[in-house]
């Protein structure tokens, strides 16, 4: 089953664009970016050429159950919720385990 669509029209206000609350109710987009709530998801994607869809409710996360404790030198950067860039999934997952699950994926690629 595909994830439910986000109805962005409910956040549009006539003449003023989108005004979002600071409510924290994270969603993960199909672009693997975590958005703080549906309204911010709509605001940040309103001018994109292609439609970003919601993947699921909650912060985006990487599956870390089958990671190796010894990592390769492969470079596929991941930005952690701590603002730090991890060189690949393996190094990110090692840090997730070390921090007992308090680290989340902010996005694929560099943080800035």
From Swiss-Prot:
The keyword Repeat appears for this protein: yes
Name of the protein this chain belongs to: Double-headed protease inhibitor, submandibular gland
Residues flagged as site, Reactive bond 2 for elastase: 73-74
UniProt KW keywords: Disulfide bond, Protease inhibitor, Repeat, Secreted, Serine protease inhibitor
Cysteine pairings via disulfide bonds: 8-42, 20-39, 28-60, 64-93, 71-90, 79-111
Residues carrying the site annotation Reactive bond 1 for trypsin: 22-23
Name of one Pfam family that matches: Kazal_1
InterPro entries registered for this protein in UniProt: Bifunctional_prot_inhibitor (IPR051597), Kazal_dom (IPR002350), Kazal_dom_sf (IPR036058), Prot_inh_Kazal-m (IPR001239)
The protein's role, per its UniProt record: This inhibitor is composed of two homologous actively inhibiting halves: one which inhibits trypsin, the other which inhibits elastase.
């Amino acid at each position: 089953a595909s994830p439910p669509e986000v109805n962005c029209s409910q956040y549009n206000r006539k003449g003023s664009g989108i005004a979002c609350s600071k409510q924290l109710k994270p969603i993960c987009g199909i672009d693997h970016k975590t958005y703080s709530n549906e309204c911010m998801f709509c605001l940040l994607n309103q001018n994109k050429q292609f439609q970003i869809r919601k993947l699921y409710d909650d912060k985006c996360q990487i599956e870390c159950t089958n990671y190796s404790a010894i990592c390769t030198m492969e470079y596929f950067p991941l930005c952690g919720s701590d603002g730090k860039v991890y060189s690949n999934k393996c190094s990110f997952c090692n840090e997730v385990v070390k921090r007992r699950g308090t680290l989340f994926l902010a996005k694929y690629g560099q943080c800035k």
